[in-house]
Amino acid sequence: MGSVLLDCAHRAAVPAGGALAVDRVTFSELVEAEVAARPNIEVVHGEVTQIPEGHVVIAAGPLCSPALSEEVMKLVGGDALAFMDAAAPIVDASTLDMDVLFSQSRYEEQGSGDYLNAPLNKEEYEAFIEALTTADRVVLKDFEGGDLFQACQPAEEVARTGKDAIRFGAMKPVGLTDPRTGRRPWAAIQLRAENKEKTAYNLVGFQTNLTFGEQKR
């Protein structure tokens, strides 16, 4: 297809089974370099407070400044804007207990694959769900709406919809075998490398609005 972004993504790719996942720092640097190298693109560093005339693509973020927000609201109306923040927990690889975790991508041989898996039995899962749904969350700011994008909800919100909801989502155990028991676990948390050095891991599907203190717990 000749996509520059896809080329950058493949160059910044980290092991993720059949998915395309990237080292976010490397990917950002590659995209920035590509943009800066284009002779037909002028890069201007500074705050935009007014929307220019003509055809414009506005991609402000992660949080739009008040001045630009007001300009956008003049065009689309204040009720059309929403903001919801969610953090994606990243775990230091040195803190992982490799006596419990096992390496396997779904439906592949044990010991193979690009994911680490933390297996949970029924009792561990239920205790985890109880802790997840009762943990302290970040208090929403006045500009943050409560309407959530259904396909990318915080893990605690998914868990609140039913005790087994997340077990059929981010924590589904299908295609996995716990080498300690030789059986499929009741549930599992998958971890994917954040970088090629594998010094940090991302909890797959665990975007959250919990406070940082609760995330550490």
Identify the meaning behind each predicted range:
Residues 25, 29, 34-215:
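Predominantly flavin-linked oxidoreductase catalytic cores and closely associated redox partners
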